């Protein structure tokens, strides 16, 4: 893990220096993220549990800068990706997802406001310092899908089983003749 991500930095100094941090870490370096992933993987049969899931890489960068013309304020932009093991909520099988985060964050002091910068998400900071490691971890946790499912239904055992069953049996439609029955009764 990059040790430089662990240090406390003054936000204004990061922004005025245009500081860039390269991210080349692993899931195991982010304790809270690892806990969230581990809870999801707990649904798997112990035989299917991936042994090296904590070794999945997180790669990218974040950059601090100043935005605004009259009253400058610190911003953080970036692009980083994590490959994460998860459990499909349809078929309960192991799958790997790619979580890409492209933050555009304005780092404001509590109560501070800004106008005409709608492209930035506002984060109010209670302190003038931050640890890039914590910011990256929080962004990754927020980017995790609430319900993980195979994008390709052809890879999902539950979808395949449903499609196969649907082809094999005629669906019973209990209300198919209801309209004609109602007309007869009138």
Name every feature range the model reports, one short phrase each.
Residues 1-186:
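Structured interface patches
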